[in-house]
Amino acid sequence: SDVYKRQEITKSDQYIKVKQQHIDDIKLKYHRTHGDRVSRHQLAWNLFKANETFMNDSAIHYLNECIALSRQMKNSTLLQSDYTALAHQYAATGFYNEALDYLRRIDRPQLKGQQIADYYFCCSHLYGEMGYYLKDEALKQQYYGLSNRYRDSLFSVLPSTSSLYLWRKVIAAASAGYYRRAMRYCDIWMNQVEENTPEYANMAFFRSEI
């Protein structure tokens, strides 16, 4: 109904207003922080996360700020995380050549813990997306194969109770036509995310696709 539509538009407007205020607050801290590169990097990273699904150009801008700060600090560990995040941001928004370029800059043997999971997730996502848009069937299957191998590697390092693990299991099961299995994973996933959060919205979207 028109009333429902107006309510949803109002909710959306309120969300954008609150989101923008949150970003402006972090931005103010960022511009007031001088000299302390560690703090500036954390604030730039927070600005990336705040813009990740909100304003792509801003997300990329602040990741480049993170990369510049990591280089200035000669902090290779932070730099690997920055490269992975930027590769994934490009992959998620359709800039596949840029994503591949930043993936190639990552020093894979140097990655540890969560960095390994993030890397596998990025690779699986990127090659899956590239495969989807390829016209050549042989190349398409090659890229899907790469995506699946990185997905399996991701499963091997993630706890089976993590939201990311359950998310990818939902996609894998649904893609293979195992819809009941996908729904079971989705039920577990739903119990782990809070309502009215981006994580819940992500779960609800994939649940609606099963």
Where are these regions (language model features)?
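Short, small-residue-biased leader/transition segments that mark boundaries at the very start
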Residues: 3-4
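Post-signal peptide N-terminal segment of secreted/secretory-pathway proteins
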Residues: 23-118
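Structural register within alpha-helical repeat arrays
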Residues: 46-47, 86, 123, 130, ...
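Residue-level signature for tetratricopeptide repeat
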Residues: 49-50, 89, 126, 133, ...
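Helix-turn-helix repeat elements of alpha-solenoid scaffolds
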Residues: 13-27, 52-65, 92-104, 137-150, ...
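Membrane-proximal low-complexity regions enriched in glycine and acidic/polar residues
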Residues: 147-210
